[in-house]
């Protein structure tokens, strides 16, 4: 009997040892601060089911792409989140470094322009937002200088940094659309994107939660961030109406809200062979219970894809 127990102990030791040799580091995820709360939620649920919780870092979309496309070795991240589609120069960097990927559109998001509950409620146009924020604009010090119907209140706006996908989306959906045609044609879109440097607009790091915190005690300040952060802090701040449309789940999904955009997650194909659990993580992420119309991510503010788009997207990656 003692022999049997010893043999059993040796077998267990051998099994544990073989597992520790093959046990890799957890799946590593980087990228967008907007996508971060969604992927963190998925990672925690995945960890409970599969025993290994992916490590998720918020680096911003641009920073995430740099890390993700740097190479296919085990030290590089397996996954990156993006609050805009991959740019052609990033796709080239990936290709040059031997990285191929699966692109998953996980849902939709609206970019909120919001202030504290004690601040005014405004209906703003893209043109007015451009005039308030642009380096090439008239640089008004008060909102009333843009339009007499707007409050006699100093302009103070917190913006995401240039590395942020939210900033990229804001540029293409607001700054480009609000920029006067003659400036756009004579100087190009990059000039239209330039923000004032006189203190009216302040860049805040890759941290949407920090922007919200800075709004709460300041009734003249506005901030720019993703809908999920608004959804989770709705009792502390309120969004402005843009071009007459309120930001809601429905207006984002229908793209009626003028600053709506898709969100993405990219998975590194080269890692499927040697990062344990990565294939399962992809399947789990796109499952009905996570990303579907009634999925877990909807509960924390992700605007789901419409059912037909969701079905096509899942079919395309099988």
What are these regions (language model features)?
Residues 1-3:
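Short, Lys/Arg-enriched N-terminal segments with co-localized hydrophobic residues
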Residues 5-14:
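Sec-dependent signal peptide recognition
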Residues 23-318:
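Flexible loop/hinge segments at secondary-structure junctions
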């Amino acid at each position: 009997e003692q022999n049997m127990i010893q043999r059993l102990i040796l077998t267990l030791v051998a099994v544990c040892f073989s597992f520790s040799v093959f046990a890799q580091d957890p799946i590593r995820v980087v990228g967008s601060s907007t996508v971060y709360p969604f992927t963190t939620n998925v990672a925690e649920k995945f960890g409970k089911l599969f025993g290994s919780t992916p490590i998720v870092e918020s680096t911003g979309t641009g920073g995430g792409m740099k890390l993700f496309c740097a190479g296919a070795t085990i030290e590089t991240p397996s996954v990156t989140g993006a609050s805009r589609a991959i740019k052609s120069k990033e796709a080239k960097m990936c290709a040059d470094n031997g990285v191929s990927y699966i692109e998953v559109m996980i849902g939709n998001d609206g970019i909120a322009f919001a202030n504290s509950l004690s601040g005014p409620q405004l209906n703003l146009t893209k043109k007015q937002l451009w005039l308030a924020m642009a380096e090439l604009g008239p640089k008004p010090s008060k909102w009333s200088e843009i339009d007499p119907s707007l409050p006699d209140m100093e302009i103070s706006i917190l913006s995401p940094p240039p590395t942020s996908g939210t900033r990229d989306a804001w540029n293409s959906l607001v700054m480009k659309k609000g920029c006067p045609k003659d400036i756009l044609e004579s100087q190009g879109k990059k000039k239209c994107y330039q923000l004032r440097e006189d203190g009216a607009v302040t860049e805040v790091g890759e941290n949407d939660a920090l922007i919200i915190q800075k709004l709460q005690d300041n009734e003249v300040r506005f901030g720019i961030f993703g809908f999920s952060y608004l959804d989770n802090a709705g009792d502390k701040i309120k969004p402005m109406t843009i071009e007459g449309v309120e930001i809601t789940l429905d207006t984002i999904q229908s793209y009626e809200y003028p600053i709506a955009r898709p969100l993405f997650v990219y998975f590194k194909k080269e890692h499927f062979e040697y990062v344990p659990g990565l294939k399962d993580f992809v399947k789990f992420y796109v499952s009905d219970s996570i990303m579907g119309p009634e999925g877990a991510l909807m509960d924390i503010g992700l605007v789901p894809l419409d059912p037909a788009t969701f079905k096509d997207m899942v079919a395309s990656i099988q």
